[in-house]
């Protein structure tokens, strides 16, 4: 079991924040409020941002900030306990208590809100409400036109209902409960059938929900579609066929060449580019190890990359790769290092 710590391995730039309050938000869901020890202002963040939480064993987990970005004296995250996950959510639920100090990273945003759109469509599945809730707060402050569709198994499984109630009363937030059968819930395909110029779409949730959203918005312009996956979700690579990011069958060995020195290193099928670089003294910052956060992104100069991240746009993939999950379709990749 992984144990959060303020004395373990984490960057020197991490923030030591105190847990001021923990609130129950639904079945298996707790919200955690972090503040500075001196009660001062925290670094500002934008809607859709996340922070890293650091564990004793060096592992890192990302959690979306879900409070109003205008608030400067607290960070709020919500954590769904997953007994079949990698241990992070269990550690937080069982070991993080009020008044404890926790190492928290600075806010980063890979899922930004595009402001100024004539209409914003937000789709949340389960705990995927977290980044979208922050967007709702921002859109409310702007007086922007938006609709949030929040899908959950039941009311008991939906977080932040009391806080979202005023928006629901105005018809801005619409709840959809399917009893555990998505076929009885929101018809995502029907909802996304309509697109108007300038509209922006955002979605976040579990794998099946994400797949349904992705398949339903293929006619939307790429620049109008924004999404954020969780760890363990299936990825749609270049050919559109779902894969498992960690598939050994597809993790073929290849070589990487360091452009600045000409050094050639072999990446075996059981190691990532980031791991091999680290073993040879070439440190590339890493965080999620799952192609979610972009911390380990580097530029490549030559080679045919098999991208397995959830983050990079088609344009970005022509220049960058994520060293934690990307592989090579050919014999060699040349990295701009």
Swiss-Prot record:
Keyword Zinc: no
SUPFAM superfamilies: 2Fe-2S ferredoxin-like (SSF54292), Ferredoxin reductase-like, C-terminal NADP-linked domain (SSF52343), Riboflavin synthase domain-like (SSF63380)
Keyword Nucleus: no
Cofactor: [2Fe-2S] cluster
Known EC number: 1.-.-.-
Domain 2Fe-2S ferredoxin-type: 254-337
InterPro entries hit by this protein: 2Fe-2S_ferredoxin-like_sf (IPR036010), 2Fe-2S_ferredoxin-type (IPR001041), 2Fe2S_fd_BS (IPR006058), Beta-grasp_dom_sf (IPR012675), FAD-bd_FR_type (IPR017927), FNR_nucleotide-bd (IPR039261), MRET (IPR050415), OxRdtase_FAD/NAD-bd (IPR001433)
Induction line: Induced in the presence of tert-butyl alcohol (TBA).
The record's free-text note on cofactor binding: Binds 1 2Fe-2S cluster.
PROSITE patterns: 2FE2S_FER_1 (PS00197), 2FE2S_FER_2 (PS51085), FAD_FR (PS51384)
Residues holding [2Fe-2S] cluster: 288, 293, 296, 324
Keywords on record: 2Fe-2S, Electron transport, Flavoprotein, Iron, Iron-sulfur, Metal-binding, Oxidoreductase, Transport
GO MF term (any one): metal ion binding
Residues of the FAD-binding FR-type domain: 9-114
Family: Belongs to the PDR/VanB family.
Subunit structure: This two-component enzyme is composed of an oxygenase (MdpJ) and a reductase (MdpK).
Function: Reductase component of a two-component system involved in the degradation of tertiary alcohols such as tert-butyl alcohol (TBA) and tert-amyl alcohol (TAA). MdpK probably provides electrons via its [2Fe-2S] iron-sulfur cluster to the MdpJ oxygenase subunit.
Name listed for the protein in its UniProt record: Tert-butanol monooxygenase / tert-amyl alcohol desaturase reductase subunit
Species, as recorded: Aquincola tertiaricarbonis
């Amino acid at each position: 079991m992984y144990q959060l710590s303020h004395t373990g391995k984490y960057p020197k730039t991490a923030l030591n924040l105190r847990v001021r309050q923990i609130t129950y938000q639904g079945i298996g869901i707790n919200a955690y409020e972090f503040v500075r020890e001196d009660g001062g202002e925290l670094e500002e963040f934008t809607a859709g941002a996340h922070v890293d939480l650091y564990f004793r064993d060096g592992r890192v987990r990302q959690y979306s900030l879900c409070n109003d970005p205008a608030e400067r004296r607290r960070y709020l995250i919500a954590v769904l306990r997953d007994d079949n996950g990698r241990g992070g959510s269990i550690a937080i639920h069982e070991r993080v208590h009020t008044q404890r100090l926790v190492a928290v990273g600075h806010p980063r945003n890979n899922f930004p809100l595009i402001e100024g759109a004539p209409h914003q469509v937000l789709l949340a599945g389960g705990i995927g409400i977290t980044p979208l809730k922050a967007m709702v707060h921002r859109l409310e402050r702007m007086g922007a036109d938006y609709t949030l569709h929040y899908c959950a198994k039941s009311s008991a499984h939906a977080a932040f209902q009391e806080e979202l109630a005023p928006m629901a009363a105005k018809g801005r937030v619409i709840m959809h409960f399917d009893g555990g059968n998505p076929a009885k819930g929101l018809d995502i395909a029907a909802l996304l059938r309509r697109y108007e110029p300038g509209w922006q779409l955002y979605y976040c949730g579990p794998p099946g929900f994400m797949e349904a959203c992705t398949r339903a918005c293929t006619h939307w312009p790429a620049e109008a579609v924004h999404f954020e996956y969780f760890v363990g979700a299936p990825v749609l690579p270049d050919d559109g066929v779902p894969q498992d990011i960690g598939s050994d069958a597809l993790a073929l060995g290849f070589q990487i060449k360091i452009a600045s020195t000409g050094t050639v290193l072999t990446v075996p099928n059981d190691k990532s580019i980031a791991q091999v670089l680290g073993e040879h003294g070439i440190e590339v910052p890493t965080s999620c190890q799952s192609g979610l956060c972009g911390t380990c992104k580097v530029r490549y100069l030559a080679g045919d990359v098999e991208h397995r991240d959830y983050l990079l746009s088609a344009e970005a993939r022509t220049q960058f790769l994520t060293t934690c999950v990307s592989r090579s379709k050919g014999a060699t990749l040349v990295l701009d290092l």
